[in-house]
């Protein structure tokens, strides 16, 4: 039985971690309740493993505080923390058999031999390895070795079990089987699991609570259902499952416009004529032969059988929708689409344009992003004045040849918005530049960045 309590067993308060001039974690605060199965989810490089290693004690926070069971342990070494860690690479001792691998920690604690025997057998039973205690670990499959690693961790009866992508090296079927076993194990043990993964489906399957991370920050914390159905921003919507994410305008409460059409929705409190992001899951779109019911009409561009459903792309007046349905429509078929009000999810836009801090050089030049840009003539401000600089997303120009740009950067995040791509480009000045483009770029592409003079708005900073 999972004995969940309101009391937090892990408290991470305003924790940051720096490696030189790079920020791995940026002011992270997280509370984990006793008995919870919490998954820290995010792409490679988001900071999830760094956070786990800080909780485990393998690294030390640059700023902030970590408590376990109310005790401050930020500087406490790993062996003195009430946690055990299971890694992707099982880290078993090849010269020891299964029994001795599991018993190793107990022997270090000078636990009585009879007690060790009972605990090892109980741990082996928990992971379904009762008949394997005297086998060499090299003779075991990957899944069996991972079970031994988990048994070695739980035999010490930690208050918290930390799992760093423990199933990543397993094949798909074995991974699915182990997911179910981990979930049952968590229920039986009743201890707190903190699990790190980049696999969205794994997180949705296993977790009581999901913590979504990106660029060293927590983006959203919630139940799997909340995270999936009510993503807080476009990153979460795109990263968790598949989504149609579109630019829209909230006309007023419960009425939104996107794709040139007005739709009823259930969202309120966004104000009138407010730019928003609209999220519709592919399975929430109804597709059928064109009829009066259709809110949008379009043509099927692709259709792929996925085993349980068909996945189709439908082009509606220049906007591309991803649709999942049990019914098959041939490529080229004219179809209607319909979405119900409660299946339209509205998100406040994180930003409506690029905003930078700058300094006016003279009437036609402004410095920002570490470079001097030509701009339209600025009246009424003296040279050297600190200013705010705004640039619309679609006015930023990216070049294949880095040397052609005023500055350079790397494409870090790509979001398809139905009729264009919204890119996050990490500039070499260590600031994000956001770009709307019809050109196809890949994550990791090095690019030149150019901003035309007439695209730069220089605004006086007011107190």
UniProtKB/Swiss-Prot annotation:
Keywords: ATP-binding, Cell inner membrane, Cell membrane, Membrane, Nucleotide-binding, Translocase, Transport. ATP binds at residues 42-49. It catalyses: ATP + H2O + polyamine-[polyamine-binding protein]Side 1 = ADP + phosphate + polyamineSide 2 + [polyamine-binding protein]Side 1. One of its GO terms (cellular component) is ATP-binding cassette (ABC) transporter complex. It is a peripheral membrane protein. InterPro entries: AAA+_ATPase, ABC_SmlMolc_Importer, ABC_transporter-like_ATP-bd, ABC_transporter-like_CS, Mo/tungstate-bd_C_term_dom, P-loop_NTPase, PotA-like, PotA_ATP-bd. Coiled coil: none annotated. SMART domains: AAA. Part of the ABC transporter complex PotABCD involved in spermidine/putrescine import. Responsible for energy coupling to the transport system. This is Spermidine/putrescine import ATP-binding protein PotA.
């Amino acid at each position: 039985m999972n004995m969940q309590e309101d009391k937090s067993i892990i408290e991470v308060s305003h924790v940051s971690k720096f490696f030189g001039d790079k920020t791995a974690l940026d002011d992270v605060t997280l509370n984990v309740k006793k008995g919870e199965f919490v998954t820290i989810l995010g792409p490679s490089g988001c900071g999830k493993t760094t956070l786990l290693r800080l909780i485990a004690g393998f690294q030390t926070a640059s700023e902030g505080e970590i408590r376990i069971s109310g005790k401050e342990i930020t500087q406490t070494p790993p062996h003195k923390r009430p946690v055990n860690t299971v890694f992707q690479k099982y880290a078993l001792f090849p010269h020891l058999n299964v029994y001795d691998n599991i018993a190793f920690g107990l022997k270090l604690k000078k636990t009585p031999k009879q007690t060790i025997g009972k605990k090892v057998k109980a741990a082996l039973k928990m992971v379904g390895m009762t008949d394997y205690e005297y086998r060499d670990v090299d003779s075991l499959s990957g899944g069996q070795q991972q079970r031994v690693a988990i048994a070695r961790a739980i035999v010490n009866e930690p208050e918290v079990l930390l799992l760093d992508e423990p199933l990543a090296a397993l094949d798909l079927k074995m991974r699915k089987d182990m997911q179910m076993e981990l979930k049952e194990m968590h229920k039986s043990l009743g201890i707190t699991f903190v699990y790190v993964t980049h696999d969205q489906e794994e997180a949705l399957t296993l977790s009581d609570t999901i913590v979504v991370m990106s660029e060293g920050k927590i983006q959203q914390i919630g139940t799997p259902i909340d995270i999936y159905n009510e993503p807080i921003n476009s990153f979460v919507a795109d990263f968790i499952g598949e989504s149609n994410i579109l630019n829209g305008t909230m006309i007023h409460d419960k009425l939104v416009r996107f794709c040139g059409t007005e739709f009823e929705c259930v969202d309120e409190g966004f104000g009138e004529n407010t730019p928003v992001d609209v999220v519709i899951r592919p399975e929430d779109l109804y597709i059928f032969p064109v009829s009066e019911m259709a809110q949008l009409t379009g043509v099927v561009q692709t259709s792929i059988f996925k085993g349980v459903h068909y996945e189709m792309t439908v082009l509606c007046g220049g906007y591309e929708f991803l649709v999942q349905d049990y019914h098959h429509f041939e490529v080229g078929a004219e179809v209607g689409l319909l979405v119900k009000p409660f299946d339209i999810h509205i998100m406040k836009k994180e930003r409506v344009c690029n905003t930078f801090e700058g300094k006016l050089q003279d009437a036609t030049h402004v410095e920002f992003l570490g470079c001097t840009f030509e701009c339209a003539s600025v009246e009424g401000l003296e040279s050297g004045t600190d200013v705010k600089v705004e640039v619309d997303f679609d006015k930023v120009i990216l070049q294949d040849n880095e040397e052609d740009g005023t500055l350079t950067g790397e494409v870090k995040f790509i979001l398809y918005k139905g009729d264009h791509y919204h890119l996050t480009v990490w500039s070499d000045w260590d600031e994000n530049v956001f770009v709307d483009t019809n050109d196809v770029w890949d994550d990791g592409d090095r690019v030149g960045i150019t901003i035309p003079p007439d695209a730069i708005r220089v605004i006086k900073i007011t107190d």
